[in-house]
Amino acid sequence: MALKPSPRADMSAITPKASSHANLPPLASRFVEVNSLPWEKSKYPGIETKTLVVDRSTGVLTMLMKMAPGAKLPDHEHVLIEQTFVLQGSLICGEGECGAGDFVWRPAGSRHEAWAGPEGGLMIGIFQIPNRFYEDGREVDFLGKDWEEAWGAAYERHEHARFA
């Protein structure tokens, strides 16, 4: 018996900068040549990223993040669960340190600052919805865009589905 397609088969997930995905069928696997993707500077000094997959309709985001020694992610909230696997170096916050080969996850609603250790860091971050950063009385995403405008609708869909 063939399985029926999931209602999620129409997700709008993409890997930016991966032109080889343009003509794939909707349910085909997307193989990402990570080394061919460019590092993109973030608005935070010493932090660069590669977006591996993002779905603006659901908020799903997986990224590779490279942090220079001491580079800092300022005050931010994990709107939903965030997961981080450290590949090299370390990621530190007021609660502890996550070193190479270690994994940390943070529950929805947790809020903190984080910074790279003396060797810097390379990590994979997996987000159900991107973090909300608090800057100058504004709530923005990692790119500095108004969080509500960028991700509010995806968050509302998630909450509606959760309580439906």
Language-model-derived ranges and their functions:
Residues 67, 80-82, 138-145:
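Short intrinsically disordered coil segments
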Residues 46-77, 107-111:
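Conserved short histidine dyad/triad with adjacent acidic residue
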Residues 92-116:
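Short acidic-glycine-tyrosine-enriched beta hairpin
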Residues 59, 77-79, 96-98, 116-118:
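Short glycine/proline-enriched turns and hinge-like loops at secondary-structure junctions
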Residues 68-69, 78-93:
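Glycine- and acidic-residue-biased ligand/ion/polar-headgroup-sensing regions
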Residues 108-137:
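Ligand-binding loop in jelly-roll beta-barrel domains
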Residues 2-58, 139-164:
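A short, N-terminal "cap"/entry segment at the start of jelly-roll beta-barrel domains
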